[in-house]
Amino acid sequence: MRLKIKQEDIVKLINISQRAVSSKSSVQILEGILFIAQNNRLKLISTDMETTIETSIDCMVEEDGEIVINSSLFGDIVKKLPRDTVNINTKGTDVEIICGKSQFYLNGQLSDNFPLSPKLSDEDLSFNIKGEDLINSVRRTGFATSTDLTRPHLNGIFLEMKENNLRFVAIDGYRLAISDIETDGKGNMEAIVQKKALEEFTKIINEDSDVQVKKSESHILLESGDTKMFSRLIDKKYLDYEIILKMDVTSEIVVNKIKFQNAIERASLLLRDGKVNLVKLAIKDDNINISSNSEIGTSNEDIACKIKGPGLNIAFNARYLTEGLRAIDSEEIVIKANGSLDPIKIYPKDDESYVYLVLPVRVGN
């Protein structure tokens, strides 16, 4: 293999590829990236056996070839090279890297044992979404997935498509986050996708990117521009989350999102010891009193709101509340409640594409 490529181009490819490299694998070849040079194009493939990334770019290929090179070492080298042409030459498993007056010689590995990328057929369900919608939906739901490894179906984000609506759902047992976006697809689909894969892909694309999504029985493919990501689906049945959404509503509160969020975050400043992470809300007479109490001290703050229905006293894990509020971009939010023991729904005013449901914490009188 012999090729010439701009330093900034190879760094771009490496940064993308390293998002799927297995850093602590017992299989040495998984710590490497497969380089394939042919037809004046360089393709890099990386995998941790759960997620696979393929990314490519045009360059000057003088001799076709392929080889596996250690990701960490190669990445460290090319990122330190000057912005000049990088020559990459291989002979057998020997790798030569030349840029300006810098020369490096590495040991590579033959590509024969590198895992093949998953294959999806033209008959698999396929549709397109906007990069901005994908980025926002993952941001608005990913934080609510469970970290409990004994419940793998809740470790991922549930994707559910009905006709041209794609829904992102995350549950951890204490809160539920849902984000809806439009697609150009038609049909129904259900898949539990690994959160990490979705989050890594959103770091690769731009908001103005177009993303093609394709699903098989075992994998989902996300493709944008010159980059593809394959992710193995979590093969479990998801919870019937719609039952959770069906709740009676006796009180409806409208409040400025930023003022409410800032007040919750200020109350949380006294909860940093980690022993208590509780904020209390006393809602009545178009006012929300927000208080916290810990060994460090106490806080108390009032903010205005508009309330329909009876007032209520309710308490929450402060982090659960603030994470949901940070996911909302609107100026005002609507909070729907049914007393102090049932969960509340929070969603942007005049926007039903996102809803966040969180359980309260029972406290004594």
Per-segment meaning from a language model:
Residues 1-365:
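Structural preference for solvent-exposed beta-strand-turn elements
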